[in-house]
């Protein structure tokens, strides 16, 4: 096994060395990056905090927070499509794509590709359970099995987050918080993300004062001003504070926070912008300003709609508001879009549930 250490933005990751696969087992692939052109070469090693890739004889160590996706030259097309679906929050589609992989397509593939199929299967099963609230035990088994077998995967942080979501769904909030511990040993962006996720556990329990305090702590964490990944996570944490303020009957404070996040976000921060307009819609509903809320949710539906969870939430609220506003045709259109496009989300399940359940 090879011992490696990755360096993030000029600073060494605190004493966190990682064991990776044999250096000789190189797999042709490409790193799709968040804010830079992609990198093609031979993938030498992966770990929770980065990927090492050989580009024409030059080794590059790329930090995990700057990587959007890792693709492999020899992977089946359906495997690639399934991973894209997982990344887009579409686990049902991912499972359909996985089913299209012919057994022969995986014969003789490199170990990283075989491992990737295991990841996509576990992420799809776990993601579907977390989104729908159904088959939680199967989701937990899949995710825990994958993490236990692949503790040095570059997908570790994402899978630990998914594990936390599943445990939260089971009402095991202390275990969910513990599942986020590996992120605390990661780069700053993931430490902020873990802190915000723990705040979310309080939010799920309707402990809004506690949640607001923890979200605020995450948003105020000390990070490098040039660390754009951490900045995005801190803006997301601020939106958590805004949602808590709405739940606590302080919509004006929530609006002020959302306005600040919107001003700090770039036009390409579509996920943050979608979450921000949903939070704005929440604040407007809390203030009794239903028409303003509709405008906020429509902004997510029509403009900042790339993140499925954001758009599903917006559609759910539009159904409720248009039903309330005596616009049955619009409500039905939004209802059908939600049920057809995002049938496995908690928002679709809430919509289909009997009133008062």
Residue spans of the language-model regions?
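Register position in tetratricopeptide repeats
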Residues: 87, 127, 169, 204-205, ...
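Alpha-helical adaptor scaffolds
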Residues: 126-127, 131, 234-311
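TPR/TPR-like (Sel1-like) alpha-helical repeat modules
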Residues: 295-302, 319, 323-346
């Amino acid at each position: 096994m090879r011992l490696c250490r990755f360096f993030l933005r000029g600073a060494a990751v605190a004493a966190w060395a990682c064991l990776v696969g044999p250096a000789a087992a190189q797999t042709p692939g490409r790193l799709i990056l968040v804010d830079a052109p992609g990198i093609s070469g031979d993938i030498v090693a992966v770990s929770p905090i980065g990927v090492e890739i050989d580009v024409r004889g030059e080794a590059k160590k790329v930090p995990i927070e700057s990587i959007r996706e890792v693709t492999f030259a020899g992977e089946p097309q359906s495997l690639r499509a399934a991973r894209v679906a997982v990344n887009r929050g579409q686990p049902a589609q991912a499972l359909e794509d996985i089913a299209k992989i012919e057994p022969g397509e995986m014969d003789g593939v490199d170990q990283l590709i075989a491992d990737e199929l295991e990841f996509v299967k576990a992420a799809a099963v776990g993601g579907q359970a977390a989104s729908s609230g159904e088959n939680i035990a199967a989701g937990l088994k899949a995710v825990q099995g994958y993490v236990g077998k692949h503790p040095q995967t570059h997908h570790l942080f994402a899978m630990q987050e998914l594990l936390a979501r599943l445990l939260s769904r089971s009402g095991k909030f202390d275990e969910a918080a513990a599942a986020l511990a590996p992120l605390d040993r990661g780069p700053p962006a993931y430490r902020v993300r873990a802190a915000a996720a723990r705040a979310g556990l309080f939010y799920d329990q309707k402990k809004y004062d506690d949640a607001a305090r923890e979200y605020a702590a995450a948003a105020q964490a000390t990070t490098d001003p040039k660390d754009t990944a951490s900045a995005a996570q801190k803006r997301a944490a601020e939106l958590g504070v805004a949602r808590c303020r709405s739940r606590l009957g302080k919509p004006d404070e929530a609006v002020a926070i959302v306005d600040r996040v919107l001003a700090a976000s770039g036009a390409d921060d579509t996920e943050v912008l979608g979450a921000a307009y949903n939070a704005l819609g929440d604040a407007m509903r809390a203030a009794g300003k239903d028409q303003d809320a509709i405008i906020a949710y429509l902004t997510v539906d029509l403009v900042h709609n790339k993140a499925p969870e954001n758009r599903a939430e917006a559609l759910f609220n539009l159904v409720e508001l248009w039903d309330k506003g005596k616009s049955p045709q619009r409500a039905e259109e939004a209802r059908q879009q939600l049920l057809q496009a995002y049938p496995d989300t908690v928002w679709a399940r809430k919509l289909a549930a009997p009133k008062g359940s």
